[in-house]
Structures are given as structure tokens and as C-alpha cells.
Amino acid sequence: MLRGQQGLHSVDPGGIEVLSTDLAGFRAVLTLENRTLKRALTDPRLVSGIGNAYSDEILHAAQLSPVTFTQKLKPEEWDRLFAATRSTLTAWMDRLRLEAIASFPENVTAFRPEFAVHGRYNLPCPRCGEKVQRIRYADNETNYCARCQTRGKVLADRSLSRLLGSDWPRTLDELEALKHR
């Protein structure tokens, strides 16, 4: 059994601590491989401490699509992503720290009513009022606002898009028209 730093190192996947790095370091790590933003942010070998819930919130705050590839981001998008990552993590760490001081949490959940998009499928986006969309895959889902993050494009959900085939709605307008058929 290893103790101290050696013990921690054996289970640490090695991702950077966003609050302890600068924009250049953040960008360098996330562009090592050309991945989608969602996948890059949730890979603990790249970034430490960002899971499914916080990645949804970060991408919404940055107004970036979860399926944009890291090597396609423009400088101003990197600025927004880095700022949103730091501010989202800081805000939630502060909030959770205060909650823990008040009382020990009775249940731990990734779905919080204060979230903007995560776990809020079909509820209104707090920024624009459009319904939050989702992409389901395996045991996870990605939540996003099509208006704020994808310029109105509805991203394909593997299970539903296979079922609907060519009838899959590509935009918010097409989705609304489909609902009124």
C-alpha cells in the first residue's frame, strides 16, 4: 500500500487542474487529439474534475456546441471556453462548499435545479427560453440549448435519429413542425 503523494499518483489519471493553468496550457492539452469538446472536457486524462454535468454547463456558458472539434475552435471561442470552464467550476465549488458547511448532503446527485441545461431536457433554457435538447448515448446524455449553442441545429440522438431516419428534424423549426403534425 502506498501512502501520500505516491498513493494518490497511482490512481490519478493525470488531467490538468483548470484552476491552476493558463489558457495556453488548457488549449495545448485539449488539442493533443482532435476530439469533440464534450469528450475532451470529460476525459480525466486531459482535464481533472469535469464530468458529464459540468461539461454541459460549461459548454452552455461558453455558447459552444458539444460536438465541435477542439482543433476547429477559433481564438475567441478558446477564450470563452476557458473563461466559462473556470467560472463554472469556481461557482459550483463555492456553492457546494457552502452547502456542505450548512449540513451534510442527504443525497448526492448530478441533477441540480440550479443547472442551466444539464438534466433539464425539454425545459426552457434560462438564457433564451428555447427548450433544452439532449443527445442520448450509452448510459449518458448530453444536454444543450440548440439556439444558444448550435445556431438552432438539433443534434442527432442516435436512438431516435435511427428510428426517424430522413425525417429527423435538423433545426428547431423542423422540430416544432414535426410536433404539430
Q: What spans do the regions from the language model cover?
A:
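Gly/Gly-Pro- and Ser/Thr-rich, intrinsically disordered tail segments characteristic of DNA damage-repair
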Residues: M1-L2, S20, R162-S166, T171-R181
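Short functional micro-motifs and their immediate structural scaffolds
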Residues: V132-Q133, K153
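Short Cys/His-rich Zn2+-coordinating modules
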Residues: A102-A116, P126-E130
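Short cysteine-rich clusters marking metal-coordination/redox-active sites
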Residues: C125-C128, C145-C148
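Short metal-binding segments enriched for Cys and/or His
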Residues: R151-S166
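Phosphate/anion-contacting hairpin/loop surfaces
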Residues: M1-L64, F69-K72, E76, L81-F82
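Short metal-coordination and nucleic-acid-contact micro-motifs, chiefly zinc-binding Cys/His arrays
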Residues: D43, H118-N122, E141-Y144
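Short, flexible, mixed-charge glycine/proline-rich loop motifs
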Residues: R112-Y121, I135-A138
